[in-house]
């Protein structure tokens, strides 16, 4: 069965949000493993790859403090604690995929998926906020890499154009 990663991200968001909510409410029984298992259960067949949900949720959960430190400079007007819990967890998931899964998830997919989560579960302006913050992260992280990539592509195009001109020039001299 094919993997449904979008659904997996929804379950991960739901689990992280539930854990945070229950913990802040003083629920000492809040356990991320049992929350994830409970949230996966109704969707296991449609989901396909349950390991994706576990890996994503635990990856974010294990690095929450570090992710929050990395997010803060990208939204300096908004202390992490003042961002809504949904938006905060969407940002964490998005940044985790951008920075820790860049070999598995293309950056634009990570940003788009986070924006879609924000549209579905956040407030009216959440998607714009998420897009802005993760767009800043993308530029900060890949700015120089993108510039190098663009230069390499331009060089390839110029080389191909020169080769084409060279071929055309040699064909004319043969006539």
Question: Model-derived features: where do they sit?
Answer:
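N-terminal interaction/assembly modules
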Residues: 1-120, 125-127, 131-175
């Amino acid at each position: 069965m094919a993997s449904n990663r979008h659904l997996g991200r929804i379950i991960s968001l739901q689990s992280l949000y539930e854990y945070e909510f229950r913990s802040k409410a003083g629920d000492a029984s809040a356990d991320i493993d049992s929350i994830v298992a409970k949230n996966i259960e109704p969707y296991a067949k449609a989901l396909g790859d349950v390991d994706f949900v576990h890996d994503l949720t635990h990856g974010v959960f294990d690095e929450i403090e570090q992710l929050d430190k990395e997010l803060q400079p990208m939204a300096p007007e908004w202390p992490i604690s003042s961002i809504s819990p949904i938006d905060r967890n969407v940002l964490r998931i998005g940044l985790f995929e951008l920075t820790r899964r860049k070999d598995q998830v293309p950056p634009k997919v990570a940003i788009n998926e986070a924006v879609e989560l924000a549209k579905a579960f956040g407030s009216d302006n959440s998607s714009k906020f998420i897009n802005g913050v993760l767009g800043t992260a993308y530029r900060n992280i890949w700015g120089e890499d993108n510039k190098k990539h663009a230069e390499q592509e331009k060089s390839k195009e110029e080389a191909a154009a020169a080769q084409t001109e060279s071929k055309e020039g040699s064909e004319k001299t043969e006539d």
